[in-house]
C-alpha cells in the first residue's frame, strides 16, 4: 500500500515540478541554515529537482509567518506548532517523519509511577512531578494540556506556570528557573554532579529530557514522570548504561490511564495520555504537497544511509540535534489528508485545547448577564469580592430582561456569560450557538452533576404494567412544569407517539391520555379537570390542586405520596424521591412505614427494575445548570476563575465577605448560581449543549414540540420550548417554583 501511495504522489507532482523551479526551506538557527545549505548542494549534485534554497528565520513562528507571506515555502514543525500554523495561518502538513516502524508516524505520551504507590490520574494533586522540560511535548504540553482539558487542573488568567506550581507538591520542570514560579517548578531538580546548573533545560540538569524525568521518579525525587512510551523500557532491565538505572526493573513501574486505572509499562497503546503526532513538513494551503514529498523522497533515497556523503537525519556534523528533521527519523512519508486536525489526532487536539490561553489576548473583564435587581446586587458584590482577591478576569455585571435576552447579548458580544437551566441551555446552544463553560454540582457524593427522572409504580404482581401501557392509568406529578415530573415524562411520551397533542394543546392531550391525574398548578381555573382529579388539597380538603405545599400531593414527595396512597398508579419523580421517603427517612405518618423494596421503576425498554437501578432504568438524566458562553470564549479561563473563587467564597460559612452559592442575603433564591450548588465543576468532555444535556433529555424536551403543532419547527426559533406548553394556559397558571 505504501508503494502505491508513494507512486501516486510522484505522478501527481510531475504536473507541477516543471512549473516550480525552487523550494525555499525556512531555518531557525545558524547551524540549521548551514545544514540546509549542505543539503541543497547535495541535492543539486545528485540532480534532484526542483532546486532547494535556504531562508533563515528567527524562530519557528517567524518561519510560519514567512511562509504565509510567500517569502518561504516549507519548514518541519512539531505538533503544537502544526496546530498553530494550521488553525491560525492556514498551513497544511504534507510530509511526516517516521521514528518507529511498529507505530508509524506517532508516539505516545505516558504518565509513569512506581508500582508500589497508590497514585492515579485522579489523585495527582499534591504529588511530586517530573517533567522532561518546559514546553516539551510529552513532558509538559500533553500532560498539562490534558489535566486542564479534563478538568483536573484549573488555570486562572492563563497563568499556567502558577497553576501547575500550585497543583503539584513540587516539580522538576527544566527551563523554569528564570520564572517567578521556580521555587515550586524547580524544587525537585538537582543540577549536575557539583550541584550547579539546577533546573537548566539542558543535559547539565540530571533530570532533564526523557531519561532524566524517569530518573527523577526512579530515585524517589518525584511520584510521577511524564515521558514517552519507550522511556521506561529504554532505561530498565539492563538496557541503560548509567549506573543510576542498572538495577531498575520495568515491572516495578506502571502507567496511569485516563479512566483512573493503571496498567503495565508494555500496555501503552491502550493506557496513555495522548497519541502524539510526529513532526511534519508544512506548506501553504495552495502549495502542492506532492512536489515537496517528491523532492524529499529523492533526497532520502540517496542521503539517509550511514555511508552517504550527506546525512539528512543526523545533526552530529553540526554539533547540534534535530536540525531540519529529528535525528531519530527513519524515513519521510507523504500525508494523504493534508489536514492538520487529521494529522494531529483527537487526543492530541484535546490536550492542546487546554493550553490555548494567551495572557496577551485575555479580556480584562468577564461580563456576567443578570436578570433582576437582587441578582444585580449580588453580581456587584461578587465583582468587588473577586477584585479584592485579585481574581482574573474581573467581573462586570450587565442587565438583561430575560434569559433569551442574555443569549442575544452574548451572541452579539455585548456580554460574555450567564448561568442557565436545562431548556434554556438547549435554546442557547441550538439557536444562539453558545457552549457550556462550567457546571454546577449539587451533592459532593454525586459527580454526575445531575439527577435521573424515573417512573415509579407499586410492586404488584396482580396489577403489573409497563411504560408502554400507561394509557388509561392514573398519574401523579409534582406540579405543572416540573422538570422531572412533567417536562421529561410528558415530552418523552409525546416523542414516542403515545401522546399526540392537537394544535399544541398539550394539557388536553395529557388529560385524555391518562384516566385521571394530579398535576398541581398555580391557578386551577380553566384547567382540565382530569389533571386535578386525583389531588386532595390540605387536611380539610381545601386548596385542591393548588401549586403549593397546601396541596398534599404537591412536589416530588407529594407525587410519591399520591402513588403510596393508591390515588395514582404511576408517579413521575426524581431517582432520589423514593429513598427520601422510605425506610425511615421520612418520619411523617404517611411515609414512616414505607419500604423502597415495595416499589419498582418502569423502564423505556418495557421492563421493570428495582428502584436502586435508576442509572439503567430512567426516562432521562437531568442536567445541572451550566454557565454558557460564546464558542470563541476560553472556557478554561472561565472555569479557572470560578474554581479559584469558590476556594474563597464557595463555603456558605466562609469569612471572606461573600457567598457564591447563597442568595439569602438578598432575600431571594438561586441568584447567579443555584443555592443548592456545592461546587462549580468543569465541563470535561461535555463541550456542546447536546453533550451537556444528554440524548434522553434532549429527546424528551423536543417531544414538547408536538408533530401536530402547526409551525412547531419554526417555533423553536422564536420561543422557548416550554412556551409551547404555555400557549394553552392563562397567565399565572404555572407555580413559581420551576
Curated annotation (Swiss-Prot):
Signal peptide span: 1-19
Residues that hold Fe(3+) 2 according to the record: 451, 556, 625
MF terms in GO: iron ion binding
Lipid attachment points (GPI-anchor amidated cysteine): 709
Domain Transferrin-like per the UniProt entry, residue ranges: 23-357, 366-706
Pfam families found in the cross-reference section: Transferrin
UniProt superkingdom: Eukaryota
Propeptide part(s) removed at maturation, as residue ranges: 710-738
Glycosylation sites: 118, 135, 515
Gene Ontology cellular-component annotations: cell surface; extracellular space; plasma membrane; side of membrane
Annotated binding of hydrogencarbonate, by residue: 132, 136, 138-139
Keywords of this entry: Cell membrane, Disulfide bond, Glycoprotein, GPI-anchor, Ion transport, Iron, Iron transport, Lipoprotein, Membrane, Metal-binding, Phosphoprotein, Repeat, Signal, Transport, Zinc
Modified residues (Phosphoserine): 462
GO terms classed as biological process: iron ion transport; negative regulation of substrate adhesion-dependent cell spreading; positive regulation of extracellular matrix disassembly; positive regulation of plasminogen activation
Subcellular location: Cell membrane
Binding site residues for Fe(3+) 1: 78, 107, 210, 279
Membrane topology value: Lipid-anchor; GPI-anchor
Disulphide bridges: 26-63, 36-54, 130-216, 172-189, 186-199, 257-271
Role of this protein: Involved in iron cellular uptake. Seems to be internalized and then recycled back to the cell membrane. Binds a single atom of iron per subunit. Could also bind zinc.
Family: Belongs to the transferrin family.
Protein name per UniProt: Melanotransferrin
Source organism of this protein record: Mus musculus
UniProt gene name: Meltf
Amino acid at each position: 500500500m505504501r508503494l502505491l501511495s508513494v507512486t501516486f504522489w510522484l505522478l501527481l507532482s510531475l504536473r507541477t515540478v516543471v512549473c516550480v523551479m525552487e523550494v525555499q526551506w525556512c531555518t531557525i538557527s545558524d547551524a540549521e541554515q548551514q545544514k540546509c545549505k549542505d543539503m541543497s548542494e547535495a541535492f543539486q549534485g545528485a540532480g534532484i529537482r526542483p532546486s532547494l534554497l535556504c531562508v533563515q528565520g528567527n524562530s519557528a513562528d517567524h518561519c510560519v509567518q514567512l511562509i504565509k507571506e510567500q517569502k518561504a515555502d516549507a519548514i518541519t514543525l512539531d505538533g503544537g506548532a502544526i496546530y498553530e500554523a494550521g488553525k491560525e495561518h492556514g498551513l497544511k502538513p504534507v510530509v511526516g517523519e517516521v521514528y518507529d516502524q511498529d507505530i508509524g508516524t506517532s508516539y505516545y505520551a505516558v504518565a509513569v509511577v512506581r508500582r508500589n504507590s497508590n497514585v492515579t490520574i485522579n489523585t495527582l494533586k499534591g504529588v511530586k512531578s517530573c517533567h522532561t522540560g518546559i514546553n516539551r511535548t510529552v513532558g509538559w504540553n500533553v500532560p498539562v494540556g490534558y489535566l486542564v482539558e479534563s478538568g483536573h487542573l484549573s488555570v486562572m488568567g492563563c497563568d499556567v506556570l502558577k497553576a501547575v506550581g500550585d497543583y503539584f507538591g513540587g516539580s522538576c520542570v527544566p527551563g523554569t528557573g528564570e520564572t517567578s514560579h521556580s521555587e515550586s517548578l524547580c524544587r525537585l531538580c538537582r543540577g549536575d554532579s557539583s550541584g550547579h546548573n539546577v533546573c537548566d533545560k539542558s543535559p547539565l540538569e540530571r533530570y532533564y529530557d526523557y531519561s532524566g524525568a524517569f530518573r527523577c521518579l526512579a530515585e524517589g525525587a518525584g511520584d510521577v514522570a511524564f515521558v514517552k512510551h519507550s522511556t521506561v523500557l529504554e532505561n530498565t532491565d539492563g538496557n541503560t548504561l548509567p549506573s543510576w538505572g542498572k538495577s531498575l526493573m520495568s515491572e516495578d513501574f506502571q502507567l496511569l490511564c485516563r479512566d483512573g486505572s493503571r496498567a503495565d509499562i508494555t500496555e501503552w497503546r491502550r493506557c496513555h495520555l495522548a497519541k502524539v503526532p510526529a513532526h511534519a513538513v508544512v506548506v501553504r494551503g495552495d502549495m502542492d504537497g506532492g512536489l515537496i514529498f517528491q523532492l524529499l523522497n529523492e533526497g532520502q533515497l540517496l542521503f539517509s544511509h550511514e555511508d552517504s556523503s550527506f546525512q539528512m537525519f543526523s545533526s552530529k556534523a553540526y554539533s547540534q540535534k534535530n536540525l531540519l528533521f529529528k535525528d531519530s527519523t527513519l524515513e519521510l512519508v507523504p500525508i494523504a489528508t493534508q489536514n492538520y486536525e487529521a494529522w494531529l489526532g483527537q487526543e492530541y487536539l484535546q490536550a492542546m485545547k487546554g493550553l490555548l490561553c494567551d495572557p496577551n489576548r485575555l479580556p480584562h473583564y468577564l461580563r456576567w448577564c443578570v436578570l433582576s435587581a437582587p441578582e444585580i446586587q449580588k453580581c456587584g458584590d461578587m465583582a468587588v469580592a473577586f477584585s479584592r482577591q485579585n481574581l482574573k478576569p474581573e467581573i462586570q455585571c450587565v442587565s438583561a430582561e430575560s434569559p433569551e435576552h442574555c443569549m442575544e447579548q452574548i451572541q452579539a458580544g455585548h456580554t460574555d456569560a450567564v448561568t442557565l437551566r436545562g431548556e434554556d441551555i438547549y435554546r442557547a446552544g441550538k439557536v444562539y450557538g453558545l457552549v457550556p463553560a462550567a457546571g454546577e454540582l449539587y451533592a459532593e457524593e454525586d459527580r454526575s452533576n445531575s439527577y435521573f427522572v424515573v417512573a415509579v409504580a407499586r410492586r404488584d404482581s396482580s396489577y403489573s404494567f409497563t411504560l408502554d401501557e400507561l394509557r388509561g392509568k392514573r398519574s401523579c406529578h409534582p406540579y405543572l412544569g416540573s422538570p422531572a415530573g412533567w417536562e421529561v415524562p410528558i415530552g418523552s411520551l409525546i416523542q414516542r407517539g403515545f401522546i399526540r397533542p392537537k394544535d399544541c394543546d398539550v394539557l388536553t392531550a395529557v388529560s385524555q391520555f391518562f384516566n385521571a391525574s394530579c398535576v398541581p398548578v398555580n391557578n386551577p381555573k380553566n384547567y382540565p379537570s382530569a389533571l386535578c382529579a386525583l389531588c386532595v388539597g390540605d387536611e380539610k380538603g381545601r386548596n385542591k390542586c393548588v401549586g403549593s405545599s397546601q396541596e398534599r400531593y404537591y412536589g416530588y414527595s407529594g407525587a410519591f405520596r399520591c402513588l403510596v396512597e393508591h390515588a395514582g398508579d404511576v408517579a413521575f419523580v426524581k431517582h432520589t424521591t423514593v429513598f427520601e421517603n422510605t425506610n425511615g427517612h421520612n418520619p411523617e405518618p404517611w411515609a414512616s412505614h414505607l419500604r423502597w423494596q415495595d416499589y419498582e421503576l418502569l423502564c423505556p425498554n418495557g421492563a421493570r427494575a428495582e428502584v436502586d437501578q435508576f442509572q439503567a432504568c430512567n426516562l432521562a438524566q437531568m442536567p445541572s445548570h451550566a454557565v454558557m458562553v460564546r464558542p470563541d470564549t476560553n472556557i478554561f479561563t472561565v472555569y479557572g476563575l470560578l474554581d479559584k473563587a469558590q476556594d474563597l467564597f464557595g463555603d456558605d460559612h466562609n469569612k471572606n465577605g461573600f457567598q457564591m452559592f447563597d442568595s439569602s442575603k438578598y432575600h431571594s433564591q438561586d441568584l447567579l448560581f443555584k443555592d443548592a450548588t456545592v461546587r462549580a465543576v468543569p465541563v470535561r468532555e461535555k463541550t456542546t449543549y447536546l453533550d451537556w444535556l444528554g440524548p434522553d433529555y434532549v429527546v424528551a424536551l423536543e417531544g414538547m414540540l408536538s408533530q401536530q403543532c402547526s409551525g412547531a419547527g419554526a417555533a423553536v426559533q422564536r420561543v422557548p420550548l416550554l412556551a409551547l406548553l404555555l400557549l394553552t394556559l392563562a397567565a399565572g397558571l404555572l407555580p413559581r417554583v420551576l
